[in-house]
Amino acid sequence: MFIFIFLSLWTLLVMGREEGGVGSEEGVGKQCHPSLPPRCPSRSPSDQPWTHPDQSQLFADLSREELTTVMSFLTQQLGPDLVDAAQARPSDNCVFSVELQLPPKAAALAHLDRGSPPPAREALAIVFFGGQPQPNVTELVVGPLPQPSYMRDVTVERHGGPLPYYRRPVLLREYLDIDQMIFNRELPQAAGVLHHCCSYKQGGQKLLTMNSAPRGVQSGDRSTWFGIYYNITKGGPYLHPVGLELLVDHKALDPADWTVQKVFFQGRYYENLAQLEEQFEAGQVNVVVIPDDGTGGFWSLKSQVPPGPTPPLQFHPQGPRFSVQGNRVASSLWTFSFGLGAFSGPRVFDVRFQGERLAYEISLQEAGAVYGGNTPAAMLTRYMDSGFGMGYFATPLIRGVDCPYLATYMDWHFVVESQTPKTLHDAFCVFEQNKGLPLRRHHSDFLSHYFGGVAQTVLVFRSVSTMLNYDYVWDMVFYPNGAIEVKLHATGYISSAFLFGAARRYGNQVGEHTLGPVHTHSAHYKVDLDVGGLENWVWAEDMAFVPTAIPWSPEHQIQRLQVTRKQLETEEQAAFPLGGASPRYLYLASKQSNKWGHPRGYRIQTVSFAGGPMPQNSPMERAFSWGRYQLAITQRKETEPSSSSVFNQNDPWTPTVDFSDFINNETIAGKDLVAWVTAGFLHIPHAEDIPNTVTVGNGVGFFLRPYNFFDQEPSMDSADSIYFREGQDAGSCEINPLACLPQAATCAPDLPVFSHGGYPEY
């Protein structure tokens, strides 16, 4: 029996450390003082029932050694013209990224389920060929690992043709060159007005640029609005616009040919900065002076009050009840493999409950944000975060804040914009958590007297992506009744805009000169459920009131509630527009039945408050077409691995992947199916979003819940269950495992020293 204990005082733990308890080989501290409790086990008891049934690394992200090998092979194959992406200019050839090439599902299942040889382990590399006569982006598959011998160009196979060079993500080197252009060449042309408004000095460090996207208004453009903000080094600069925005055309391969196409300053547009300065000198510009300590309000995250009593802590009196081996997590109920796509973000594979596979893949695909405003950057911004990299911009998890202090933390290795692998420490965490709520319970006071119940204890897999200002907390939560919850929480700084004119039509004022612009957050997920096997059917169930004569009084009528059931036959029938009607119960079912003759199924239940979808007459809507649907179910195809693309952000007008193409009215009866789920919320920033948006109320996602999959509620077999009846001694350890706590939980947790994974260098 294992129970979490909440500690609200640190005294016991501090005493234990100060007295210098020594850990034994089993992780249990020896008492150096008779009044001090022993240390709790730091490892799982050896007799726990879980195992890692498959040690295959099919879904494991590439190791540092594999990444190094692939980069060496690519350097050898692509020749001496290859430049380190960290230093590459637009006219250079460079390897942008290397990550795992996921294996075909059929080959993976043949290995996992039937013992066939594992499919070749391969890497996917994205290469920028800026030095070729026709600059382009190429995707290369390299394998087999660990000793690659081939490199296969899959660009045409995957995308139907070459990838235009202007679709490539912006490298850090390109951003630095743009900054150099702005600060060394452009801003000095308006030194007078900028000194007046914003304490500008040439060569100073008080200002910085903020990026926006997309980059233009039509395919082929590479023109970005950059906002100028105060450089608040001890807090977020995101809240401190000075009212200057520059439209920079950086499509040319030579940075010397980049130009500023338009200037916006505090409510008016100018052809260039020289024109702005000329009109300022002529007294034709009404300048709002912005204090050089920011635009007012509270912006620092440093608390102004001293630390208080230590918050509650959860720990494992008898050691963790799960284990992590490589990328595989196992507990007594659940097993799954985890990973992180460099661009698409967190994902899990081969998810099994009590040994039976429920899902082949559950993965984040895209996160989008659509903004409004009356400044050019705000009104144009439509972010697709895979275009920046939700894995690439993952951040170290902070022990005790991002995850429980005693969670298990894992690193991630990657190659993005570098010739050598980098390591993100503490990129993932896994922990078991008592949610302080019963999973189920009943206290019987009638006819017979008893109590039965079980605590809601869950297994959580988590990562966090910081997309410049916003932080997204990504959770996959595994429940003891076979349910899975997939959830997104948003926090961090809002993206702000300069306040002028009719700004309040587009949000709320959150600072003296700062608008919090209205925007939407949406996340799109791929859910490859395999309910009782690969052949699944889609059922929609709901309710209806049906007028019925009362059998014993036929002259009277009642509105009788009954269940409506419909099998959905095609992809069109199973595509539910965002904001439209959808069945309250929708589930994927197997051809197998449970004990009661119902098809074994898993229900998809969304928890979402998404804003309206982008209008389909928008020229860039097709890049966001996944956002049309709250839920869509399609046949699974190897040719439809993802609902979005790293290349969609910089060319949304001709998207590399248009999710709406996946829905082409094919049959979904008895097929291997994928559910595509959208979850999101509308955010109208307000005063309480300063300095940071909080996670409370800003969490959305979906549940995967068993629906007649079992013959009864599966947690009835839980070793955590509690039951006692009248006449029994509920305080007896033999009757009630909770009564064992005074003996079982007299240890103090062996807390690791606090450490921080550092600040990634991009």
From Swiss-Prot:
Q: What happens to this protein after translation, modification-wise?
A: Topaquinone (TPQ) is generated by copper-dependent autoxidation of a specific tyrosyl residue.
User: Signal peptide location in the record?
Assistant: 1-16
| Cofactor comment | Binds 1 copper ion per subunit. Binds 2 calcium ions per subunit.
Q: What is its EC number?
A: 1.4.3.21
Q: Name one GO biological process term.
A: amine metabolic process
Top-level lineage group: Eukaryota
Name the positions where Cu cation binds.
H519, H521, H683
* Single annotated GO MF: copper ion binding
UniProt modified residues of type 2',4',5'-topaquinone: Y470
Tissue localization of expression: Liver.
Chief subcellular location equals secreted
Catalytic activity from the UniProt record: a primary methyl amine + O2 + H2O = an aldehyde + H2O2 + NH4(+)
**Active-site positions on this chain:** D385, Y470
Q: Which UniProt keywords apply?
A: Calcium, Copper, Disulfide bond, Glycoprotein, Metal-binding, Oxidoreductase, Secreted, Signal, TPQ
Q: What are the names of the required cofactors?
A: Cu cation; Ca(2+); L-topaquinone
- The segments labelled Disordered in the record are 23-54
A single Gene Ontology CC term:
plasma membrane
The residues that the entry says bind substrate are 383-393, 467-472
Q: Please state where this protein is localized.
A: Secreted, Extracellular space
Indicate the quaternary assembly.
Homodimer; disulfide-linked.
Q: Give the note.
A: Inhibited by amiloride in a competitive manner.
Q: What is this protein called?
A: Primary amine oxidase, liver isozyme
